[in-house]
């Protein structure tokens, strides 16, 4: 008996995305066509088991392959904070360094008294818009950030309004640079 390769499991990518190619092509074309391309802003809807999460995963895979940064999240409490954290991760900074005397007898012994301590870098709380704009500065011309937000129907309207507003302003900020659309650092959202 041959096993069915299609196992409808939450988020599991099937071996074939039947009937989805036009949507995938629209998204891919949106990434390629530069700022303002309609395929860059999508809302995937459907009943439970339709494959919405799979489509978002496919968009993320496609964007990554084309050199875009991808932030994939689920619309739940703290959505905007998690996006800011993903875009502007905190690193470590040198908190203090103490270089003390060093003693060495070649071939016999050596000693050094010194220490360094590190702490998480202190970072001002970034707004979502600031975090996106800062990250875009690091992206290659014509590339940008793809946001895939799963379970958007269950999101707090406040989170979705905050995200939509930030994206709208970032797109406008890019327009104010007088850079050709094909070279602008863009945003895509699904």
Model-assigned labels for residue ranges:
Residues 1-42, 86-89, 175-181:
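A short, basic N-terminal segment
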Residues 35-164, 184-187:
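P-loop NTPase nucleotide-binding core
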Residues 161-182:
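Conserved catalytic/switch belt of AAA+ P-loop NTPases
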């Amino acid at each position: 008996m041959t096993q069915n390769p299609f196992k409808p499991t939450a988020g599991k990518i099937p071996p074939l995305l039947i009937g989805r190619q036009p949507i995938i092509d629209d998204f891919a074309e949106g990434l390629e066509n530069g700022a303002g391309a309609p395929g860059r802003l999508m809302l995937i809807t459907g009943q439970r088991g339709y494959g919405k999460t799979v489509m978002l995963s496919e968009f993320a895979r496609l964007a990554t392959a084309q050199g875009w940064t991808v932030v994939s999240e689920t619309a739940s409490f703290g959505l905007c904070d998690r996006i800011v954290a993903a875009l502007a991760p905190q690193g470590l900074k040198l908190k203090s360094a103490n270089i003390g005397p060093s003693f060495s007898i070649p071939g016999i012994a050596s000693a050094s008294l010194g220490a360094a301590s590190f702490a998480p870098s202190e970072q001002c709380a970034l707004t979502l818009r600031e975090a996106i704009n800062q990250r875009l500065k690091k992206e290659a011309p014509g590339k940008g950030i793809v946001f895939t937000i799963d379970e958007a129907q269950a999101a707090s309207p406040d989170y979705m309004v905050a995200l939509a507003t930030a994206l709208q302003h970032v797109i406008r900020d890019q327009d104010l640079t007088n850079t050709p659309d094909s070279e602008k650092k863009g945003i895509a959202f699904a």
